Swiss-Prot record:
The organism's taxonomic lineage, starting at the top: Bacteria, Pseudomonadati, Campylobacterota, Epsilonproteobacteria, Campylobacterales
GO annotation, biological process: pyridoxal phosphate biosynthetic process; pyridoxine biosynthetic process
Additional information: The active site is located at the dimer interface.
The name this protein goes by in its record: 4-hydroxythreonine-4-phosphate dehydrogenase
Reactions the enzyme catalyzes: 4-(phosphooxy)-L-threonine + NAD(+) = 3-amino-2-oxopropyl phosphate + CO2 + NADH
Subcellular location: Cytoplasm
Organism listed in the record: Helicobacter pylori (strain J99 / ATCC 700824) (Campylobacter pylori J99)
Residues the entry annotates as binding substrate: H126, T127, K259, N268, R277
Gene: pdxA
Gene Ontology CC entries for this record: cytoplasm
Length: 307
């Protein structure tokens, strides 16, 4: 069977993205046919910063339509407008290749959201861009590994805005889309307020969540969704024995326990997108950039998911 062709966007070159590409190429190329969306000159510069520890000539790198950012000992680990613009163009090119079926999927290495903002990129991050590009699809950010998956009802929005987003109709649409994509038989849904609202004592959001769960289960014809569960105990060991699938109303409530348990191996997946996309479950790691310290387990797991 032919290996799948996977486009790999470089992420922010001032972080660990290029190190991950270089140090993982042998293992990645055993899993798929990687297509790196980055100028070969940047890979060579990255290798020099890494004491020429890796082979660069065998990598299939495609120059993207963007000016080369500076990459040297003075720029690494710092927010750069040029690097933000470059990482966006690399990502956009990956999507274009997937849309045209020139690749089977895309793997996105971590970007810096502030660098995107400084480069006047009108999207908060990868998922926000995908939601705008594929508006007819209910795209869901799910992070995890085989032991635990968390779907986020809201992702990169201020916590103060989440309450207004929790509406029965929107949540039913989300829950049904999540179940359809994952084919999960049981999904535990975290509550929003302390003690999942204590029957309305702490806000009305959890009553809406309960109603959405009931309507979703009725539509499915079986009791798929459980909850809302008090979020402070939802990820206890006895709860995780029930199912690996969870839904969280907000970003940190779901991802704090996931990353505490499985940070190195988890990945980020875009459910319901018309293209196959996975990413690492970590950021640019500016603090260890070009120190040969980057853990590539999450990156390899993302490639395995796509391949």
């Amino acid at each position: 069977m032919a290996k799948k062709k996977i486009a790999i966007s470089c992420g922010d070159i001032q972080g660990v993205g290029l190190e991950l590409i270089l140090k993982s190429h042998k293992e990645v190329s055993a899993l798929c046919e990687p297509l790196y969306l980055v100028h070969s000159e940047l890979l060579e510069r990255a290798n020099q910063l890494l004491d020429n520890a890796y082979e660069t000539k065998t990598l299939n790198a495609i120059a993207i339509d963007a000016p080369l950012p500076l990459l040297n000992s003075s720029t690494i680990g710092k927010v750069s407008t040029q690097s933000g613009a470059y990482s966006f163009e690399s990502f956009k090119k990956a999507c274009e290749l997937a849309d045209s079926k020139e690749v089977d999927g895309i793997c996105t290495l971590p970007i810096n959201k502030l660098a995107w903002q400084q480069a006047q990129i009108p999207f908060v991050g990868h998922t926000d861009f995908l939601k705008q590009r594929y508006k007819d699809h209910q795209i869901i950010m799910m992070l995890g590994c085989s032991k635990l998956f968390v779907g986020l009802f809201s992702d990169h929005v201020p916590l103060s805005a989440v309450s207004q987003l929790i509406q029965v109709k929107a949540l039913v649409k989300f829950l049904l889309a999540f179940q359809k994509s994952t084919q999960a038989k049981i999904v535990q849904v975290c509550g929003f307020n302390p003690h999942a609202g204590e029957e309305g004592l702490f806000g009305e959001e959890d009553e809406k969540i309960l109603k959405a769960i009931q309507e979703s289960n009725q539509t499915l014809g079986f009791e798929c969704f459980l909850g809302p569960l008090p979020a402070d105990s939802a990820f206890a060991p006895n709860k995780r024995k029930i199912t690996p699938f969870y839904v969280s109303m907000s970003h940190d409530v779901g991802l704090a326990p996931l990353k505490a348990l499985y940070f190195d191996e988890s990945i980020n997946v875009s459910l319901n997108a018309p293209i196959l996309r996975a990413s690492t479950d970590h950021g640019t790691a500016f603090d260890i950039a070009y120190q040969n310290k980057a853990n590539h387990k999450s990156y390899l797991n993302a490639i395995k998911y796509l391949a």
